[in-house]
């Protein structure tokens, strides 16, 4: 039986049949389907307590201060967020406010640079 035939047979199974298959595989090979998750979550007994922190991959750009040229800041907000004029003005009037959330470090730095060009202060979290 080829790999493709096995996959096709699995695709045609019901949920109950799949559950029975998993149980049979666990018994046949002496493994547990949940074991890899439990092992990954628990630190090893001899492992160092403080592992290096993972580098953040998503950042939030927060407008802290508008500066002297509010109109230019509103234009940048509209360019980055796609908001309408009124929504962008309301956002600028109620700082500190998040401008963009969950963006890459590179994009966050580009957004920050655009705001700094028009005199606004931005924080990246």
UniProtKB/Swiss-Prot annotation:
Keyword list, A-Z: Ribonucleoprotein, Ribosomal protein
GO biological process, one term: translation
UniProt-listed Gene3D superfamilies: 3.30.1390.10, Single helix bin (1.20.5.710)
GO molecular function ontology, one term from the record: structural constituent of ribosome
Claim: Ribosomal protein is one of the keywords in the record: yes
UniProt xrefs under Pfam families: Ribosomal_L12, Ribosomal_L12_N
One GO cellular component term noted in the UniProt record for this chain: cytosolic large ribosomal subunit
Family the entry assigns: Belongs to the bacterial ribosomal protein bL12 family.
Subunit structure: Homodimer. Part of the ribosomal stalk of the 50S ribosomal subunit. Forms a multimeric L10(L12)X complex, where L10 forms an elongated spine to which 2 to 4 L12 dimers bind in a sequential fashion. Binds GTP-bound translation factors.
Function: Forms part of the ribosomal stalk which helps the ribosome interact with GTP-bound translation factors. Is thus essential for accurate translation.
UniProt name for this protein: Large ribosomal subunit protein bL12
């Amino acid at each position: 039986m080829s790999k493709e035939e096995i996959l096709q047979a699995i695709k045609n199974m019901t949920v109950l049949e799949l559950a029975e298959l998993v149980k049979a595989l666990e018994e046949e090979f002496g493994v547990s389907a949940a074991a890899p998750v439990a092992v990954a979550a628990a630190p090893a007994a001899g492992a160092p307590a403080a592992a290096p922190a993972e580098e953040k991959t998503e950042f939030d750009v927060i407008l802290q201060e508008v500066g002297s040229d509010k109109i230019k800041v509103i234009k940048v907000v509209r360019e980055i967020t796609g908001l309408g004029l009124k929504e962008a003005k309301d956002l600028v009037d109620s700082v500190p406010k998040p401008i963009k959330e969950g963006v890459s470090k590179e994009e966050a730095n580009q957004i920050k640079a655009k705001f700094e060009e028009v005199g606004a202060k931005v924080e990246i979290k």
